Structures are given as structure tokens and as C-alpha cells.
Amino acid sequence: MNKVCFVVVLVLFVALAAYVSPIEGVPTGGCPLSDSLCAKYCKSHKFGKTGRCTGPNKMKCKCLV
């Protein structure tokens, strides 16, 4: 029973992680380390021409056109 619960929780976690878009609320693009890494992330994935780290702790990369 313990292994079954573990597998169910693991499957739910993977499904939730796959459902969340990488540019919505998930720290991406090098934030909070560097705005230049965020800009490079935006350019390489064609989300915009530049980008910067935003949010309370600069944890979210926001791409700008």
C-alpha cells in the first residue's frame, strides 16, 4: 500500500509540473541571477526581443517585445 501511495503522489506531481507553463509563475530565464540571462532566454525562445526579472524577489522573467 505504501508503494501505491508513493506512485500516485509521484504521478500527480509530474502531471502538475507538466501542466504549468514555463513562463507563468515559474522562475525561468536565469532570474534572479541576471537580467541579461533573462533577455537571452526570451530571444532564444522567441518570446520577445528583450527581457528583465520582475516580481517581489525578481524571480520571474518577463519578456518584452
Curated annotation (Swiss-Prot):
A GO cellular component entry from the record: extracellular region
InterPro entries according to UniProt: Scorpion_toxin-like_sf (IPR036574)
Coarse class of the protein's main subcellular location: secreted
Leader sequence residues: 1-25
Expression (tissue specificity): Expressed by the venom gland.
Note: Negative results: does not have effect on BK currents (KCa1.1/KCNMA1 channels).
Function of the molecule: This recombinant toxin inhibits the mammalian voltage-gated potassium channels Kv1.3/KCNA3 in vitro with an IC(50) of 26.40 nM.
Name of the molecule in the record: Toxin KTx8
